[in-house]
């Protein structure tokens, strides 16, 4: 299993603060029952980072209002 590092995610979201916001927002969504966009059996925080590193989600999710 490949390990996800912050450097992998920083290639997609260069600002560390935006990266943290996007990862925590997505992890919260996953823990509330949203479907993951990548195949994983990890906890929501790791899954969120995997999605960011894969380019499945990005900072555009911070601009959306949950509905």
Swiss-Prot record:
First-tier enzyme category under EC: transferase
Source species, domain of life: Bacteria
A biological-process GO annotation: DNA-templated transcription
EC number: 2.7.7.6
Alphabetized InterPro entries for the sequence: DNA-dir_RNA_pol_omega (IPR003716), Pol_omega/Rpo6/RPB6 (IPR006110), RPB6/omega-like_sf (IPR036161)
An example Gene Ontology molecular-function term: DNA binding
Any Pfam family hit: RNA_pol_Rpb6
Subunit structure: The RNAP catalytic core consists of 2 alpha, 1 beta, 1 beta' and 1 omega subunit. When a sigma factor is associated with the core the holoenzyme is formed, which can initiate transcription.
Function: Promotes RNA polymerase assembly. Latches the N- and C-terminal regions of the beta' subunit thereby facilitating its interaction with the beta and alpha subunits.
Name of the featured protein: DNA-directed RNA polymerase subunit omega
Organism: Leptothrix cholodnii (strain ATCC 51168 / LMG 8142 / SP-6) (Leptothrix discophora (strain SP-6))
Gene: rpoZ
